[in-house]
């Protein structure tokens, strides 16, 4: 019995060891991670976008102006406003000159020229020095000399590049009908009347536009704008200038207060704007 039981016990022990070993091996196999497949190849890099074509610079207003005919303008009408009275007798005459640079009349005149000629022309303002202004002052007759406007245009043109055309906007005298008096530039006029004993009051803008050749400064054309035709002025006692009738309450008192008057400023600017447009169109149309 003891000999049979011993081999049987040994066999049973071997079976148990075998079973345990197999179970452990299975467990180790399960614990091992499965072999990973090779990682997929990375997608090829995206093709670099083609460089955008360099945008051509747009033509600026300045470059456009370089290719256009140029009109250079010197305006001197916006410096003073006259408060003027013409009495029945010479002792009733008076004239006060008031600075009005703040009204911007010269800039207005040049903008209006640009409006009329359109974008086909490049218009720019020429500065006017004090020495150039003296060339416009009346001088005693000294024989046949060169037109003073030639010297004035040459002075304001300077030594820089020449313009195609030069234009000037300057005060011009206008005879007051029925008197030996005249007005010039911008102002308000009170005119005594011996017939009906009623004073006539007018705001006026008496000026002239002239055009000159850009190389020789030779005069090309000139226009003096008026509100009414010359024949109408002669028949009605009007002014050969831009003007409008106003109430006598418009007369500034004291005269120095004219520069602060909005109604005088606005009325004057309107006359200048209308007159410059008339004269510029006439110059463009030619003689």
In which residue ranges do the predicted regions lie?
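Sec-dependent N-terminal signal peptides
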Residues: 8-15
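N-terminal segment of the mature soluble domain
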Residues: 83-179, 199-226
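Positively charged n-region of N-terminal signal peptides that target proteins for export
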Residues: 1-5
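General N-terminal leader/first-domain-start detector
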Residues: 28-118
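Outer-membrane beta-barrel translocator domains and adjoining extracellular loop/strand segments
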Residues: 180-185, 236
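C-terminal/domain-edge helix-coil "capping" segments
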Residues: 28-32, 46, 51-69, 77-79, ...
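A solvent-exposed, charged loop/short amphipathic helix patch at secondary-structure junctions
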Residues: 83-103, 188-194, 242-258
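C-terminal segment of classical bacterial N-terminal signal peptides
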Residues: 15-26
């Amino acid at each position: 019995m003891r000999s049979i039981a011993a081999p049987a016990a040994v066999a049973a022990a071997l079976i148990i060891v075998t079973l345990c070993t197999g179970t452990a091996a299975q467990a180790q196999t399960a614990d091992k991670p499965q072999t990973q497949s090779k990682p997929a190849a990375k997608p090829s890099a995206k093709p670099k976008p083609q460089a955008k074509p360099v945008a051509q610079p747009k033509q600026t207003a300045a470059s456009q102006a370089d290719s256009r005919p140029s009109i250079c303008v010197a305006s001197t009408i916006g410096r003073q406003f006259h408060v003027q009275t013409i009495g029945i007798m010479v002792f009733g005459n008076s004239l006060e000159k008031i600075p009005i640079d703040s009204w911007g009349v010269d800039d207005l005149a040049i903008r209006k020229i640009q409006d009329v000629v359109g974008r086909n022309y490049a218009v720019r303002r020429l500065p006017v020095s004090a020495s150039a202004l003296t060339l416009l002052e009346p001088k005693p007759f000294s024989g046949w000399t060169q037109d003073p406007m030639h010297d004035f245009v040459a002075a304001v043109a300077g030594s820089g590049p020449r313009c195609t055309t030069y234009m000037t906007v300057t005060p011009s005298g206008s005879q007051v009908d029925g008197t030996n008096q005249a007005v010039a530039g911008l102002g308000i006029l009170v005119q005594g009347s011996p017939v009906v004993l009623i004073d006539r009051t007018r705001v006026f803008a008496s000026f002239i536009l002239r055009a000159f050749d850009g190389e020789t400064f030779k005069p090309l054309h000139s226009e003096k704008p008026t509100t009414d035709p010359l024949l109408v002025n002669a028949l009605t006692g009007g002014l050969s200038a831009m003007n409008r009738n106003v109430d006598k309450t418009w007369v500034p008192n004291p005269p120095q207060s004219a520069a602060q008057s909005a109604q005088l400023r606005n009325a004057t600017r309107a006359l200048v704007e209308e007159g410059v447009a008339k004269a510029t169109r006439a110059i463009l149309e030619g003689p």
